[in-house]
Amino acid sequence: MATGGEEIEPYESVPDDWNYLGLESIDKACFAIYPDQPNPLQATAVIKSWLGGPVPLDYISIYQNNGDPVRGVPTHWHYISYGFTDLYGDGRIHAFSGPGQLSGFGFELTFRLKKQESDDAPPMWPTALLNKLANYVFKTGNMLHYGDHIPWHKPLDEESESCIQHMLVALDPELPSLDTPYGTLEFRQIVGVTSDEMKMAQKWKGAGVIELMATVKEIGPLYITDMQRSESIFQIDPNLTHQVLEGINNDGSNLGHVTAVCLWIDINMSYQSEGLEAQRVTGLTDRMEEVEPQTLEGVHLLFDAEAADLLLMIARARLMKGKYFLFHNANNQSIHLIPPDCAGEEGIFVNQSEPLKFQGSYLQIYCSESLLEQMSAEFEVLQQSNNEMPVYPREFHFSEPTILITVWPQGQLMMDANYVSGELDMTAVTET
């Protein structure tokens, strides 16, 4: 019996008269790769989600891939989900769309885990991981795209002391896109990464780091996750760091939006009393189009250390490249940083003369060239690494416009502001 409302059972093909063409299409794609495994091990929901069960994915098939020594591909376990797309065509989970349209969310997730010598059977924790990601997608409606990064902040297996604690989203190198009678889908592969690899993906682009990972034999062209890997690709091959830095200089960063621990407050309000209450009230504004944008004299921005770690990259690789950046928090507050090149675009209501305006819980800040130069210089200290622990809170002051930025240790802003209940799933989404 697997955890999380799943059980392990031998694969049972669907009777022909059931005619579940979405499920059958995935089966055929898998059989083309694994013709010797027509009946793979399968994790299946004890009670399907459409019958009220807690597990969103109906099935996860698990194959043994024997690898390819010539290509540097090790033996590994290949996990393939069933449930993000329309499996049945009868509307029980996803509305029917038809050929040429997205089937359900338009993708299934896969995961490749290196087989260890001690493995007598495939580990089952990846099935729980895929279901957690499915819960996020089903509850929020936010899809996982190629190049997206998923900060996780703990070993993916939740038991070891592995440094593989985050994820990137690649395309499965072997499973093709499908056009089924119930719609189209592609297979997007979850790839476990280290903190260094995650930071590089955030600073540049997830797709670029994924391409670099394929060149390193410890990961290879099939993007194998090895929970025993102890070094990042940038430690294995220092030349890859130079490629990322060159990419940032040439392209900027593709990271345009992140959900993080952050907060904005009218600078004229007290953070401890009126400001926090005002934040709660404005956070209730769901229909922003009914509220006229209002001008602020100054704004107080609060970030935890993890979110603040992005500020230098945002200034140099986004805003100074003419690209916007959007912070979003768990209370539906948004901080939209807008460079001069984006002023005047549809939906932008700030400019040089009115640089600070808000609409409900949505804040826009016009970042002039002079402000960006100051930010680039001031935020340099956030990237300095030495043996001394930074002193918190850290403050940055800007006068044109009036902006106070306070950085708190990771986890402390959440407790002090008390504006997030439960675990925050911080998901970064790349700009397409």
At which residue positions do the language-model features occur?
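Short, surface-exposed linear patches
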Residues: 132-133, 211-214, 387
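Compact, glycine/acidic-enriched structural inserts
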Residues: 111-146
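Long C-terminal appendages of very large multidomain proteins
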Residues: 265-432
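Aromatic/basic-lined ligand-recognition segments
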Residues: 15, 21-24, 32, 36, ...
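N-terminal alpha-helical "arm" segments
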Residues: 1-31
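A generic structural micro-environment signature
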Residues: 119, 156-158, 175, 421, ...
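Residues that cap or initiate secondary-structure elements
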Residues: 115-117, 196, 371
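Short acidic, glycine/tyrosine-flanked loop/strand segments centered on an H-E-D-like triad
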Residues: 94-119, 408-411, 416, 423-429
